[in-house]
C-alpha cells in the first residue's frame, strides 16, 4: 500500500490555500459594513487594484464568474444586446450561460485560434449592421481573455489587444478583458498589467488563482463604470503584495513539468504552448495506459490532475 505523506494537486491553480501572512492579515483586518458605504480594507484593495490596472476605479466581488457577468451586463444594459467572444472563452463555456439567462445578452462566438486570439477580420465580420437592428441583436461589446485558459495559458500581446481596442472604438463598441490570470500574462510577457489592459473599458482579475488569496475578483474600469456596490480583502492585499513576484517561479516549474512529461513514452506535451502556469498533456493512442488508469495511478500516489478531453 502506498503511503502518501504529501498530496500534489495539479488539477487547477484555483486549489490554493492562504499563506500565514494572509491569515494574520485577515485576523487583524479593519472592517465595517460595506452596504452602508465604506469598508476600509475593501476600499484599500479597490484603490490599489485600480492603480495596478491603470483604471479610475475598481470593485471587489466574490468570484470571477460574477465579475464577468457584472461587466457584461453593465456594457449591455439593454436586453437583446450582443457580445462577441471566443468559442473557447471561459465566459462562453464555463460560466453557466449567465449573460443570457440573467442578462438577456446574446453571445456571438468567433473561433479561438490555438494561441487564444480571434482573427481581427472575423471579429469585424461578426459585428452586426445597425441598419438591421429590427432583425438582429445589437452588438455592444467584445470580450477577450488573457491569459487564455483553454489554450493552455497562452498570452495575448499588447499589440493584439490594442488592435482589438481600435476595432471596438471604430464601431462604437466596448472592450472587456477577462483577466482572471492577467498577472500570469504580465509576468510571462514582461509587460505591466496596466499596459496589457490599457485598451479595455473594463477588466477583471482573479486574486484566488495563482496569487493564492482565499477568494475574490476585482473589476476595474472608469468611475462611471464602477459604482460602489473585509476580511477577504485583507488576504487579497497580501496576495498582491507578496505573491505576484512568485508567478515567474510557477511558470518555470510548469515548463520543467512539461519537459518531464514529454520524456515519458506514451505522453506528449507541445512545449511551445507552455507560456504560463497551465500544462496540457496528451495520452497518445499507442500508449500502454489509458486515461482512467493513469489518473487512478497518479491519485494513488498523491497527485491530482484534471481531464480536459478524452485523451487530454
What are the language-model segments listed below?
Residues 2-311:
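Conserved PLP-enzyme active-site core in the AAT-like
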Amino acid at each position: 500500500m502506498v503511503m502518501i505523506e504529501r498530496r500534489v494537486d495539479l488539477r487547477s491553480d484555483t486549489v490554493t490555500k492562504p499563506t500565514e501572512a494572509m491569515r494574520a492579515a485577515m485576523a487583524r483586518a479593519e472592517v465595517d459594513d460595506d452596504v452602508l458605504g465604506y469598508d476600509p480594507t475593501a476600499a484599500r484593495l479597490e484603490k490599489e487594484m485600480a492603480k495596478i490596472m491603470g483604471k479610475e476605479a475598481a470593485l471587489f466581488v466574490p468570484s470571477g464568474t460574477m465579475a464577468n457577468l457584472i461587466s457584461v451586463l453593465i456594457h449591455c444594459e439593454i436586453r437583446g444586446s450582443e457580445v462577441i467572444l471566443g468559442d473557447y472563452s471561459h465566459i462562453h463555456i464555463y460560466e453557466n450561460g449567465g449573460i443570457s439567462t440573467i442578462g438577456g445578452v446574446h453571445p456571438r462566438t468567433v473561433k479561438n485560434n490555438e494561441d487564444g486570439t480571434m482573427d481581427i477580420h472575423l471579429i469585424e465580420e461578426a459585428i452586426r449592421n445597425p441598419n438591421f437592428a429590427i432583425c438582429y441583436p445589437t452588438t455592444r461589446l467584445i470580450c477577450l481573455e488573457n491569459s487564455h485558459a483553454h489554450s493552455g495559458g497562452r498570452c495575448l500581446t499588447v499589440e493584439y489587444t490594442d488592435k482589438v481596442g481600435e476595432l471596438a472604438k471604430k464601431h462604437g463598441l466596448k472592450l472587456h478583458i477577462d483577466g482572471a490570470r492577467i498577472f500570469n500574462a504580465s509576468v510571462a510577457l514582461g509587460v505591466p498589467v496596466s499596459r496589457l489592459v490599457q485598451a479595455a473599458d473594463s477588466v477583471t482579475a482573479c486574486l484566488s488563482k495563482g496569487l493564492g488569496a482565499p477568494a475574490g475578483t476585482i473589476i476595474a474600469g472608469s468611475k462611471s463604470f464602477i459604482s460602489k456596490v473585509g476580511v477577504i480583502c485583507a488576504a487579497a492585499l497580501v496576495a498582491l503584495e507578496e505573491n505576484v513576484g512568485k508567478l515567474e517561479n510557477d511558470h518555470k516549474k510548469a515548463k520543467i513539468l512539461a519537459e518531464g512529461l514529454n520524456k515519458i513514452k506514451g505522453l506528449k506535451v507541445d512545449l511551445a504552448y507552455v507560456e504560463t502556469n497551465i500544462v496540457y498533456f496528451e495520452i497518445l493512442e499507442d500508449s500502454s495506459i489509458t486515461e482512467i488508469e493513469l489518473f487512478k495511478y497518479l491519485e494513488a500516489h498523491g497527485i491530482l490532475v484534471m481531464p480536459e478531453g478524452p485523451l487530454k
